[in-house]
UniProtKB/Swiss-Prot annotation:
The keyword Lipid metabolism appears for this protein: no
Topological type in the membrane: Multi-pass membrane protein
Protein known as: Potassium-transporting ATPase potassium-binding subunit
Keyword field contains Transcription: no
One protein family per Pfam: KdpA
Organism: Polaromonas naphthalenivorans (strain CJ2)
Keywords from the UniProt entry: Cell inner membrane, Cell membrane, Ion transport, Membrane, Potassium, Potassium transport, Transmembrane, Transmembrane helix, Transport
Length: 599
């Protein structure tokens, strides 16, 4: 890594720490209900409208049923808006209705906080669909994840009550007093720095010269046509005009990052200058992705009565994050050995970023693109400023591994921390076995019931990813979507399932995934990957809440020091990553060995 790479990383972590600490204090107050009186008076009518109140607690299965019903209704609403958008207002570009399979996939994608996009936003979605369906779910899916980790906080902090809070109260407070205020401020900042915010019709402008190109031919339903072999039917196009898409971008961009959603208003996502114009907006977008996940660590420490617990979890996350950045940046700075015999200068200098610049924006370069790639995949965000499919084999493997760890390195809003706490429970259990003592974490005994639920929560996503990859590789419809042969084609499929199953949403975009096969397969992976983990986590929270809190004794294993941090990191790497080693060996590892030794 160059000196500038280290400087950017240090600046980022310093700014993150400064911003996350005060937000963590506020998150703890929201979780515990210690809000100013005027806020409670504002939210009271909303809660009455929902038929509940702030003092009406739920047990874990009531909380889970409310959460599942809420998200199921969101799924139906997003699906309906897509299917009806052709006859609804705020559609100046005349977008057609989305096909049933694509609408199904997109609805699950945004409800599950994955934001996988098999479509191009500016070519498919009306302004109404973007705002009322997708942007709304950006708020609600993020609030759902934070609500679940709040419930887990209460499970650790409760003293034999069995109650873990009220889902409706949590979602209302998180949305009203956290996500909306932060998004408003961030949207104003983005709009002031060049991110567009309007309802104008698309604008046609003349280009400097005529351009000829090929594009997939589409049918009446707006979907690409396929030939008998399943390949896209191409058509030749010549034009001297360019269409500039417009829209209310800044308002959606803010919650896209703060909620670790990641779904772009435009197909190029945050590489598009209308979403991310310059280095300043890019830095703050990176900061926004990790802001709430980092702040939740501090809130966790406050809620369980020991700030050191939050620092320990944050330290484990940060160490793994830094290792990933240190791995990906040199891989991208090394460049492509196939270009060296052609006399291409790939050395970094004052005049060029050097390295592997394929698929990257010159306004960001290698350092920011590599850092962003790790942030967005560590945090289950999935927004991109560079095409991960164009990274070097090892450079592309790092984002894949970040997802396959279970999105626990900071992770999504709420999801990252509850995922890491599940690994903490496992780490405590393993340490208890080694010393012959009943394991306990934060004063709660970890027994067979909790370990069964922990095993389910950890194994759900690897099963979905590996089984889904096997199905896609074996099925003709799955192989038809692969643009590249050999190891990289396998990596494209593995990346897609890793992204969907772990609710990230980024892609190796060479995979043609907007087909009935992939829309269905990835949709199921996203839904089960989201709620197949949430339900066991809530069950663990309920089980812990019903237990008494034990006093600390000389035999209690400390869970706030460097030893526990190392144990936690080791547990995440050994349990979370070993599942995928054979698959990674068939994809990026083989591709790397084919690329470098021969050159």
């Amino acid at each position: 890594m160059t000196a500038s790479s280290w400087e950017l990383l240090a600046l980022y972590l310093g700014a993150l720490l400064l911003a996350a600490w005060p937000l963590g204090i506020w998150l703890a107050r929201i979780s515990s209900g210690r809000l100013p009186g005027w806020m409670q008076r504002v939210e009271a009518p909303l809660l009455r409208l929902a038929g509940t109140s702030a003092d009406q607690a739920m047990n874990w299965w009531q909380y889970a049923l409310a959460l599942l019903a809420f998200n199921a209704l969101g799924l139906l609403a997003v699906y309906a808006l897509q299917r009806l958008q052709a006859v609804l207002p705020l559609n100046p570009a005349g977008m057609a209705a989305i096909s049933p399979d694509s609408a199904f996939n997109t609805a699950i994608s945004f409800v599950s906080n994955t934001n996988w996009q098999g479509y191009g936003g500016e070519a498919s979605m009306s302004y109404l669909t973007q705002m009322l369906a997708l942007a709304v779910q950006n708020f609600l899916s993020a609030a759902t994840g934070i609500a679940v980790v709040f419930a887990l906080f209460r499970g650790f902090a409760a003293r034999a009550t069995g109650a873990i809070g009220n889902f409706w109260v949590d979602v209302t407070r998180i949305t009203a007093w956290l996500l909306l205020p932060l998004s408003l401020v961030f949207a104003l900042f983005l709009a002031g720095n060049g991110v567009i915010q309007n309802f104008d019709a698309y604008k046609d402008v003349a280009t400097l010269e005529a351009t000829s190109y090929q594009q997939p031919k589409t049918g009446l339903d707006g979907q690409p046509l396929k030939d008998a072999q399943g390949a896209a039917v191409m058509e030749n196009v010549r034009t001297d005009k360019q269409t500039l898409a417009m829209g209310p971008v800044a308002s959606q961009e803010a919650i896209k990052m703060l909620g670790t959603n990641g779904g772009g208003f435009f197909n190029a996502n945050s590489a598009h200058p209308y979403e991310n114009p310059n280095a300043l907006t890019n830095f703050f977008q990176m900061l926004a992705i990790f802001l709430i996940p980092a702040a939740l660590c501090f809130a966790f420490g406050r809620e369980v009565g020991d700030l050191r617990q939050g620092w320990a979890v944050l330290a484990a996350m940060t160490v793994m994050f830094v290792i990933a950045v240190v791995a990906i940046t040199p891989a991208e700075q090394a460049g492509n050995p196939l270009l060296t015999p052609l006399g291409v200068d790939q050395a970094a200098s004052a005049l060029q970023a050097g390295g592997n610049m394929e698929g990257k924006e010159t306004r960001f370069g290698i350092n920011a693109s590599s850092l962003f790639a790790v942030i967005t995949t560590a945090a289950s965000c999935g927004a991109v400023i560079a095409m991960h499919d164009s990274f070097t084999p090892l450079g592309g493997m790092v984002p894949m591994v970040m997802m396959q760890l279970g999105e626990v390195v900071f992770g999504g809003t709420g999801t990252g921390l509850y995922g890491m706490l599940i690994f903490a429970i496992l780490a405590v259990f393993i340490s208890g076995l080694m010393i012959g003592r009943t394991p306990e974490y934060l004063g709660k005994k970890i027994e067979s019931h909790e370990m069964k639920l922990t095993s389910i929560a950890i194994l759900v996503t690897p099963i979905l990813v590996l089984a889904g990859t096997a199905v896609a590789v074996l099925a003709g419809a799955g192989r038809a979507g692969v643009a590249n042969p050999g190891a990289h084609g396998f990596s494209e499929i593995l990346y897609a399932l890793s992204s969907a199953g772990n609710n990230n949403g980024s892609a190796f975009a060479g995979l043609s995934a907007n087909t009935p096969f992939y829309n269905t397969l990835l949709g199921l992976a996203m839904w089960l990957g989201r709620f197949g983990v949430i339900v066991p986590v809530l069950a663990i929270a309920g089980s812990l809440a019903a237990k008494k809190r034990l006093p600390v004794t000389p035999g209690t294993m400390p869970t706030h020091g460097p030893l526990f941090v190392l144990l936690l990191i080791g547990t995440v790497l050994l349990v979370g990553l070993l599942n995928y080693v054979p698959a990674l060996a068939l994809g990026p590892v083989v591709e790397h060995l084919m690329l470098w030794p021969a050159h």
